[in-house]
């Protein structure tokens, strides 16, 4: 049944307006963007098919135009609409961070890092540079590839911190496997960075490891004194 034939108030758009956006499932949210489905397939059913095809919403939104447009009923316009929605969310998170809310709202930091790093097919090691009031100066991706204790160079981190005149930092990296649990190598890297930053009187506030759906905080686990 097409969405236009659903009882009044039951379509995803009406549900959003009447009950709020948080009441919609992933498929219903995507259906609002798609607007229409295919013959014999509603927009919600099409959205559900797309999500399943890529193993989840994250996989779908990280897929290339070529991959997405192979699906029946999906062309460049629908792909562009999805990408625009993702980018708007990313820019809002970045704008909020730039307003200095990072430490007063830990969830904002997690959301920003999740948007930045969770969909990468390779490891990225990055740093949030903060001023003396813990406002964000800049987010910088420093290293890419296989991140281990040998591939992250404390001297490069220190050089960047001095260049930007940062007073404190939060480092972060992703696990493409989707599992956020820190490794022994992650803990070694953190200790080396903490010691290097102490030599220039800069605080390492946290090391966050980003997975598919969660972020592990070293500070919350008591691993950063």
Curated annotation (Swiss-Prot):
Signal sequence annotation: none
Family classification: Belongs to the UPF0758 family.
Domain of life of the native organism: Bacteria
CDD domains (alphabetical): MPN_DUF2466 (cd08071)
Binding annotation for Zn(2+): 173, 175, 186
Disulphide connectivity of cysteines: none
Protein name: UPF0758 protein Shal_0429
Protein keywords: Hydrolase, Metal-binding, Metalloprotease, Protease, Zinc
An individual GO BP term: proteolysis
Domain MPN: 102-224
Motif (JAMM motif): 173-186
This protein's record includes keyword Zinc: yes
One family name in Pfam for this protein: UPF0758_N
Gene3D superfamilies, sorted: Cytidine Deaminase, domain 2
SUPFAM superfamilies noted in UniProt: JAB1/MPN domain, RuvA domain 2-like
Molecular function terms from GO: metal ion binding; metallopeptidase activity
């Amino acid at each position: 049944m097409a969405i236009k034939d659903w009882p009044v108030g039951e379509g995803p758009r009406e549900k959003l307006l009447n009950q709020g956006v948080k009441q919609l499932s992933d498929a219903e949210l995507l259906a609002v963007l798609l607007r229409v489905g295919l013959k014999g397939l509603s927009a919600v059913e099409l959205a559900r098919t797309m999500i399943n095809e890529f193993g989840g919403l994250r996989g779908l939104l990280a897929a290339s135009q070529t991959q997405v447009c192979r699906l029946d009923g999906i062309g460049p316009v629908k792909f562009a609409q999805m990408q625009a929605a993702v980018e708007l969310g990313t820019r809002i998170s970045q704008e909020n961070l730039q307003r200095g809310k990072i430490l007063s709202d830990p969830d904002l930091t997690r959301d920003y890092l999740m948007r930045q790093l969770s969909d990468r097919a390779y490891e990225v090691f990055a740093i949030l540079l903060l001023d003396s009031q813990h406002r964000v100066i800049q987010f910088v991706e420093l290293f890419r590839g296989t991140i281990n204790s040998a591939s992250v160079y404390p001297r490069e981190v220190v050089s960047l911190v001095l260049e930007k005149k940062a007073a404190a930092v939060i480092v972060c990296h992703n696990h493409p496997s989707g599992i956020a649990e820190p490794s022994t190598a992650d803990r070694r890297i953190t200790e080396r960075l903490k010691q290097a930053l102490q030599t220039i009187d800069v605080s390492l506030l946290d090391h966050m490891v980003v997975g598919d759906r969660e972020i592990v905080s070293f500070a919350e686990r008591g691993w950063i004194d």
